[in-house]
Amino acid sequence: MKIIGIKKIPVKFFENSKGDLLKFVSKKDHFFKSFGEVYFNEINYKKKKGWIKHLKNQCIFSVAFGEINFKLIDGRIKSKTFDKEENITLNKNKHSVLIVPPGIWFSFTTNKKKSILVNLINGTNSLEETVKSKKIKNYYIK
């Protein structure tokens, strides 16, 4: 089921024999709110990261290298899609950004040797703004 507010948006990809160019974000993009921080997150084969939920920040994700599989669960109690789940894959072949609004739990993994995730948040990360858990519903992160 589609979670309200989750968007996977194709972005430009420029093939080049010297190395491809992958667009990430422009301040002109309709989904761009503001710049807070950018993180590059490496993930190794079959490892899982998460569960994470931002209380105020929107995440804009893109894959810089490899392929990443996301598990998303709506944690917004007043949402029509509360507790619903969605699986989304990002990779270079179908280059896209994934917009995750505040209140959505997410985790991610890769089936590649290594993948790199880029995450732009519209505010600054803090312990008060970010919630982490090892288990959401029946899904565990070790």
Please place each PLM-identified region on the residue numbering.
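Non-catalytic, conserved peripheral segments adjacent to functional cores
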Residues: 1-94, 113-142
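Conserved metal-binding segment of the jelly-roll/cupin
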Residues: 90-112
